[in-house]
Amino acid sequence: MLVAQKFACIKITGRASFNSSIDFKVLLNELLQKGFTTFVLDLSECSLMDSTFLGVLAGFGLKLTSANNGAQSVSIELLNLNPRITELLENLGVLHLFKLNQGTLKLPEGTETLPHNAANPTREEVTRACLDAHKTLMEINPENVPKFKEVTQFLAEDLKKLKSHD
């Protein structure tokens, strides 16, 4: 992750999936709480995103869109998306939440690399994150309800079972 002033660039490599979605969500929320206002996700090396990661990303995009109704402008840019991910975002009806860009990123002066620690979530936390992400996709675009209705029902049941074992 690269940071400077209120700018953060997060490089997503390989397959962006439910496994990395909690770390991603925690990181974005931490940066937002610290006052970062410009977010760039470098997707040049991201081969695929699953629906959970897409739901987390869309939820953050929605959160920033809502935050922009306030005084401070917050933006999220997706850099160098491959056509498959662009198509997924479009089909899920969430592409409008992001600014898209291709090419080389011009980094602000004073940019430095910042490490991020993994969250190591429990199975219950992963299940809850998956459920929340899919609910977000359905709330943003009602056309997603038939796509994810059964998934959310399964995840809700699984979450209930996990909680009852505590």
Model-based region annotation:
Residues 18-27, 33-98:
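Amphipathic alpha-helical interaction surfaces in cytosolic regulatory modules
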Residues 1-12, 23:
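Short beta-strand/loop segment at the start of cytosolic alpha/beta domains
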Residues 109-162:
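Charged/polar low-complexity intrinsically disordered segments, enriched in acidic residues
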Residues 3-4, 32-34:
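Flexible, charged surface loops at secondary-structure boundaries
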Residues 85-88, 107-111:
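Switch/connector loops and helix/strand junctions flanking conserved nucleotide-binding motifs
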Residues 99-106:
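Short acidic-hydrophobic, aromatic-tinged amphipathic segments that line or gate anion-handling sites
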